[in-house]
């Protein structure tokens, strides 16, 4: 490994070949056309990218990474940041799963009623990250009970090419019934049959119930992070 700045995306991929978790994080959040630089060393790994809005996003992973400058920075949870320069935003976890074992699962019904999904999310999951009309969405899955939409979620493909779940939501009257697990499992079957081999998932750190549900499906924890916003000087 090296501790000097690396400007070639392919070189970073090669250096991370023996660290699958760092490799997956980098592949998820650092598209080649937006990549700026990375620093790889035994005690940590960091990289920065240009975001769509022109700002800079960076990640700092491990016990003692080089913290690259960024308007928004995500670090391994527990890493101390200068509170005079950065404001804590949110803590979240990244999970991942291989889809092959879901290939024979009952397929998820795919929804095209975007108005219904929009109203559902506004009522039952207002903090959803992805909404109908988002160009990254591959499809919306759904579960119904006698015609009533009771669970929905999106499979999206990010600019890195990584496929992720987003906006998994259950009707407030139908929670704790395993519907999110069922929907995600069925959607993984759809993904596998369409040639998608791995799917990721981000969860707020405090959402213990959701994390337990996804772990029961088979999702593996890739990393635990805290995001920070750079304060105006």
Segments predicted by a language model, with ranges:
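Conserved GNAT acetyl-CoA-binding A-motif
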Residues: 68-78, 191-202
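Conserved acetyl-CoA-binding loop-helix of GNAT-fold acetyltransferases
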Residues: 64-69, 170, 176-193, 211-216
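A conserved beta-strand-loop-helix scaffold within acyl/acetyltransferase catalytic domains
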Residues: 129-139, 144-171
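Hydrophobic alpha-helical segments and helix pairs
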Residues: 64-108
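Short amphipathic alpha-helix that is part of the acyltransferase structural core
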Residues: 1-24, 91-128
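N-terminal charged segments
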Residues: 1-79
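Glycine-rich acetyl-CoA-binding "A-motif" of GNAT/NAT acetyltransferases
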Residues: 44, 148-151, 209
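Conserved active-site alpha-helix within GNAT-family acetyltransferase domains
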Residues: 78-88, 181, 205-223, 231
